[in-house]
From Swiss-Prot:
Subunit (UniProt): Monomer.
Cofactor info, note text: Binds 2 magnesium ions per subunit.
Organism: Desulfotalea psychrophila (strain LSv54 / DSM 12343)
Record gene name: dinB
InterPro entries hit by this protein: DNA/RNA_pol_sf, DNA_pol_Y-fam_lit_finger_sf, DNA_pol_Y-fam_little_finger, DNA_polymerase-Y, DNApol_IV, IMS_HHH_1, Rev_trsase/Diguanyl_cyclase, UmuC
Name of the protein in question: DNA polymerase IV
Length: 376
């Protein structure tokens, strides 16, 4: 039987570890990377010292401060994190072309061909983690198994800096003991539904038929059925076609001031234009998202006949989307823009990349908001 060798490598507290690496005075202190506690920010990540206080990613910075008042808060340095991530991904590709990044700090590696017949994936994972430490001075954990499902779960077992292996002959016993909340795709709601059926572990899950699970959980039920039996045929995909990209920002203070709204939209357009350029992509549909101070949310979408790629094109679409939005009646809390119907350059007609000057880029929004531009 053909058996794959899959490694899942996950950096340990990636953002926080970079900050502690670069600033030795932050080591062994409860460090939180993200928003500041007096604002509306959230925790992007935190070091293991901070996790002992119950702090975790996506928690509000204010809540994190209450749990640990002496924690050190630092703002993210995303440009640096992306640079380090590229360095780590390059290390992975020294061993295999089959690398599937899941985020800046984790990836799947299919090392089946590299190891050929008798090579040890566990020893290789140890070698890769050691090389990451040597070149970046950062710690990584790894999970090794014959499919993605088990490799990803295994990588979390001995954090930080550990390596866990689930060989085929031990998979069933491993899954039997596995808490249902550890299964891929099982969030709080699904976990609650499963527990109401008496499903607490992988062993419990395996007692149910595929048809039953699909009736209760839709298409995900089929995935749960096979995972409970240690089966996951998903390949490691080096290039994933993203269906959309988006950027949004939560304002420090609610506002309906035209100048602030304009500046935020221009910034979001620039970020998305850069993302399209970096990914060699074009977009054809733009969606604007507005969340007001009362948490009501409005979205407006526009599809163009020809794909676009530059910030000026994005900005010129916005006035028609803003026309039907209530921008003055109540303050705005959040603004976001997303792009969809993405195609890669070469598979679609490419627009002519004109060097649009900055004044043209902002004129369309200025006219919409009736803002009088300052004379030079």
């Amino acid at each position: 039987m053909y058996m794959r060798k899959i490694i899942h490598i996950d950096m340990d507290a990636f953002f926080a570890s970079i900050e502690q690496r670069d600033r030795p005075e932050l080591r062994k202190k409860p460090l939180i990377v993200g928003g500041l506690p007096r604002g509306r920010g959230v925790v992007a990540t935190c070091c293991y010292e901070a996790r002992r206080y119950g702090i975790h990613s996506a928690m509000s910075a204010n809540r994190a401060y209450k749990l640990c008042p002496h924690a050190v808060f630092v703002k993210p340095r995303m440009v640096l994190y992306k640079e380090v991530s590229l360095q780590i991904m390059a290390i992975f590709r020294e061993y295999t072309k089959k690398v599937e990044p899941l985020s800046l700090d984790e990836a799947f590696l299919d090392v089946t061909e590299y190891l050929q017949i008798n090579g040890s994936a566990t020893l290789l994972a140890r070698e890769i983690c050691a090389l990451i430490k040597l070149r970046t001075d950062l710690s990584a954990s790894a999970g090794v198994s014959y499919n993605k499902f088990l490799a990803k779960i295994a990588s979390d077992l001995k954090k930080p800096g550990g390596i866990s292996t689930v060989p085929p002959e031990e998979a069933r016993q491993f899954i039997d003991r596995l808490s249902i909340g550890k299964f891929y795709g099982v969030g709080k709601i699904t976990k609650s539904k499963m527990q109401s059926l008496g499903i607490q572990t992988g062993k419990d899950l395996r007692q149910y038929s595929k048809d039953f699970l699909m009736k209760r959980f839709g298409k995900a039920g089929s995935f749960f059925f096979y995972n409970a039996r240690g089966l996951d045929e998903r390949p490691v995909c080096p290039y994933q076609n993203r269906k959309s990209i988006g950027k949004e920002t939560t304002l420090v203070q609610d506002t309906n001031r035209p100048e602030e709204i304009r500046d935020i939209l221009i910034n979001l357009s620039s970020l998305l234009g850069k993302a399209l350029e970096n990914n060699s992509q074009l977009a054809q549909t733009l969606t604007l998202k507005i969340r007001y101070s009362d948490f009501t949310t409005t979205t407006r979408s526009l599809s163009l006949q020809k794909p676009f790629s530059c910030p000026a094109d994005i900005e010129e679409c916005l006035p028609s989307l803003l026309t039907n939005c209530n921008l003055t009646h109540k303050p705005i809390r959040l603004l976001g823009i997303s792009l969809s119907k993405l195609t890669y350059i070469g598979s679609a007609p490419r627009p002519i990349p004109l060097p649009f000057p900055k004044d043209r880029r902002s004129n369309c929004l200025n006219r919409f908001f009736a803002i009088k531009e300052e004379s030079p």
